[in-house]
């Protein structure tokens, strides 16, 4: 990894067939260059947020990073818990900026480091962890020096780091994993620690004014590891010799200890640690949540004290629950990534996380259906869009996130919302086989093999219906005027030729709703009546599409049941 030069003071540092083939190759190269140039020009003025972020890096290095070095992107992970949707969000969004920068620069080299803060001392026992007493007995120790309560890895941190890597690999992210413990223990951070010790007082001058009076008495940029208990200590530290790393502090039992801060015998306070990492690794870009706004400010000052440069970055808003309250692990009011992937699709998750990172988002099951449908709507629009519009299309960015190219604008033949309405009629015990038999009314070659994306939507829709929709559906009896309109609809469906189109069916429904004899003040009232009497829901799909999918005979049975009620 990139390291900075060190200094001893705390000052700032800143044939015909052959000819034909060659001509063809030259023409292809020219066309490719023209396409690439057009992309670069469009990217330079794009207002899509990944390009806005990438443009910051272009200003940082107008001629590219010195020496042709790759621009370094970083994401952080605290391994006191398992990877979660926030972890995915940060790696995905950082990757989107990375790919935008590559497009903006015509392929400038980049790297993404996934950094694990596994030297942190364990402050409390996480929920839902086996062998909690094992963790309780090791509170305060670095996460990488605590036994694994799952019994599968060298330490608790090793277990969670493995989960992180498996998690990131599952989604195809391109990254390099770096462990804080490995860096501290191997001496990989010793040079950076030397610099911190040299600048100890200057760092205190940054941090002390931000602390309460009581905290100032014990605050030290360096946190020694007790030689007796192995706990990361929060005690005052006297720097004796930055070159050798020698420090003096009082241990938990009152013994005055002199030991080196190097080789894993200490770690740094959070804000100092973040700044040191930026400095040591040469980080150019890192984003974080709104809750770390002050950390960005103070760590930015500290990295400048060390002689480094604060990275570019984005401060994003945090998730809210369906009531607009902050999501809390202790409350359990959030949505896990496993839950999203049960009731939605991977593409829809990426799409939802792409949109407006600086705006607070509600995160609950109710937002998933719209995200699924909007993803495919944007996907279908992509091929027909001009280049500047493509760069503003979330799907363009998502398809390129892991090295792919923007797709050909394909889409799915049925919306997720329509699937939910179909399955809602079939009931809580609906099966995939049933759904595919109905899809045969609407989709050519209706099979999971021919339509894998649709198959994933069917899976998610079945789970959503089973757990959330079916228990709430309740059809009501139609009013007398609604019953007359339903009877008219049934009569017209009975006279239709085989295989009517969704549009033909929609026109029939539409004309009945406009018939003043049935007394609907607006078409919305008629559609609402259809949803409530036939589907058991206050809202629903375009009825023409639903009838085409469900089938005319089956729809007539629904009408008959409603009229009988």
How does the language model describe each region?
Residues 35-127, 273-295:
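N-terminal catalytic cores of NTP/NDP-binding nucleotidyl/phosphoryl-transfer enzymes
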Residues 119-136, 192-193, 197, 326, ...:
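Charged, often glycine-rich, active-site loop that binds/positions anionic groups
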Residues 291-296, 317-463, 535-565:
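Catalytic adenosine-cofactor/nucleotide-binding cores of aminoacyl-tRNA synthetases and other
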Residues 133-154, 167, 171:
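A glycine-rich helix N-cap at a beta->alpha junction
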